Amino acid sequence: RPLTQQEMAKLNTPHGVVVERAEGPAAKAGIRAGDVIVALNSEPVDSIEQMKAVVERSRDRVAVLVQRNATRFFVPVPLG
């Protein structure tokens, strides 16, 4: 789900989608429920639709910028 204005202020980020349930390749790569996906392949995301569009343009992997609490890190997630 998209971040609320309050969450954006608390996390100090203007973009992001909250992971409500981690499954499949994302979960295997280490993404957890409660993480915030800030960008995919260096493209900021604010909605599931934006995330799907980036994934559709990707080949075999997506570089996911994750924010967990105050820490940001990249997670490579294989596609397919």
Residue ranges and their predicted role:
Residues R1-G80:
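C-terminal recognition in membrane/secretory proteostasis and scaffolding
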